[in-house]
């Protein structure tokens, strides 16, 4: 009984101490924020379902675009002010170049290897290797790959138009992105009619979905300091998800290593092997970099494609403007052979500004990674003209959703208006950086942009994208590691 009473007393003292730490002001210039509770901090106030929306409400309450938020035991700031963001991510990059560490990121990044979760010299070395590897990849081969993948996608969904059936494109966009990455990284073709549940991609698809579930935001044990070590060993003991997918990637690595020709790399994995080497540590880095590329380029691109389709279905006027632009470009091409299909390629992009504006406007209104990847403050520092104080150890997040709906940066932010990205008189482009900014900008942004452009342009050229019974599709998102649309279906009508 005495032991129990002692433990309860210790726990009470811990709760009081936790409450005190979370609510004392450490500097007169620190950001404002709501009352922090013991253990959980502000995780209840911002919620799990729509934290980006709740944070926008708090910005109005405190009348500032920087908020102090306790994520469990971790002091964090959420930013939606462009000047402050640029000051941190560009001007003071060295102090904010690292990623914060947690049990989940340690498990998911092979002890902070790779590109997404690494910091310091490890990140700098990996970044240079990946940039060089992507530069060495044959551009012509990549363009051909993308054209073929887009043709396969359109061929596969054309059955719904011919059968006059409604369908949800989620599965097909996800398969398109995974198939593209599979070919780009492993040089393996996936037949367009192959099923994701039992084909070549099945194991990878299943494990990727499990990883996104595992990493879903809001796991309390990942945010309580005294639980960090036991939680990590628990994860290590029970983990099957990361082990399975890393095992799959290592098998691909071994097969490549047996047949590699350093002078003639077949794919990105060959180039990574050439750049890194073949030591045990090199294998761990190659495995993690490969996993990072799949994670960064799968759900983000697939979900963005869905949001663009939804916006086009809900905005038929903008869809027709885009179609007329595409039709003009295609009709101006010299067709040598009637058998050659009239289609959009990446070379047409400079002549299709409205399509690009639609993509950007959708990404503004529906950023799929609303908070980006956090940064870590290495030392106490002041930021911005207001001299906000950011303490050492603070986690730093960008609220992309709040930026996109800020009238200071985007006039009539709740209106879908692609023209805002065609006008030189506004600051839309200066406020638009969906792939991040500074030295840690997303390395795969060009491939992602190419995929988005080719899929959307060729779909609009071939089909009218329509809602069912002319009812608008619900645009409320489901918050997770990425923000995805609710269930919906569309119709295709041949042009």
Curated annotation (Swiss-Prot):
Q: Does the keyword Heme apply?
A: yes
Q: Which GO terms describe its cellular component?
A: membrane
Alphabetical list of PROSITE patterns matching this protein = CYTOCHROME_P450
TM spans (from-to): 3-21
EC number(s) per entry: 1.14.-.-
InterPro entries, per database record? Cyt_P450, Cyt_P450_CS, Cyt_P450_E_grp-I, Cyt_P450_sf
Location within or outside the cell: Membrane
Task: Give the enzyme class.
Answer: oxidoreductase
Q: Which family does it belong to?
A: Belongs to the cytochrome P450 family.
Q: What is this protein called?
A: Probable cytochrome P450 508C1
To which species is this protein native?
Answer: Dictyostelium discoideum (Social amoeba)
